[in-house]
């Protein structure tokens, strides 16, 4: 392993396998002409640090572990790689992407469709909470790429509507969450149905040691493109805490903050569905315009809320961690942790909502006396310092 500071690394230090070279431009990756057109039409000019290292390795067929910060183009890293290796003449599933949430799976589908705009690519989002008949119809028609959640994908494979014999690549996005206890068995279920030579790509902002250890079960001699853990807290995101003496005082603190700030768009995180519903009602009673989302809402409702937020029709979204991983809304300038996350690794996914692709952002954590230990644990884990919020926080967001 060695530390590498190559093209577009923006001072991020990668602990990367020695054979990994840096491709400074997309042309240097020798991609299909139609794919290059899609990349430039999507708005990319040059590859990010993780893209310049990982895409070529994945396209060579190597099993790959790619770890980089939220907002650095991880989704495009594997999407471009998939589009390079599939054969669109063959209308069979050739790549499978598994994600922990329905929203993320749908977003990945839209990125693949956009990047593959000049390639006539078929990509279907195979997710729970949707009409199973639509899945069957789309899969029977033939999809080059399937982006889905583990439960529905496993179900479609078992029913033989998702045919796996042509699959050459499996991507596990947000792998730490996927491989947590909830999804582990479903991942193994899916993996058992894939051809033995299937290439595996693991992508995430955080890769705890136990996850890296577990990847040995289904990866062969993987190439690593890794960023050191203590580099993971996002550059460009200012982190603060507000000491709140009692839980009951958090709401007044939030209202005061809301009155003080001019917010483009903000996300407020709570730890439970019940808290999300309660806070949404309280904010509306106080005449604030907010929308909310959690995992137990019907999928159609979640889609509609996401659409409104993406289009800027709603400025503040209150959510559980279902929203914390990989959802890309460019205008988010502020994240408020109304509750500190119970899992310290979700902290980086939450605050990664603001300041994406080098934009500036602010993360504010509400901390009761019970939370001080959790805050210190987060600081230690990410080798970062979270300061008390200054009086002039409004200037930081302007």
Swiss-Prot record:
The keyword Nucleus is assigned to this record: yes
Residue stretches making up the Helicase ATP-binding domain: 55-225
Catalytic activity: ATP + H2O = ADP + phosphate + H(+)
Localization in the cell: Nucleus, Nucleolus
CDD domains named in the record: DEADc_EIF4AIII_DDX48, SF2_C_DEAD
Gene3D superfamilies: P-loop containing nucleotide triphosphate hydrolases
Binding positions for ATP per the UniProt entry: 68-75
Motif (Q motif): 24-52
Keyword tRNA processing: no
The family this protein is said to belong to: Belongs to the DEAD box helicase family. DDX48/FAL1 subfamily.
Domain statement: The Q motif is unique to and characteristic of the DEAD box family of RNA helicases and controls ATP binding and hydrolysis.
Protein name stated in the entry: ATP-dependent RNA helicase fal1
Organism: Aspergillus oryzae (strain ATCC 42149 / RIB 40)
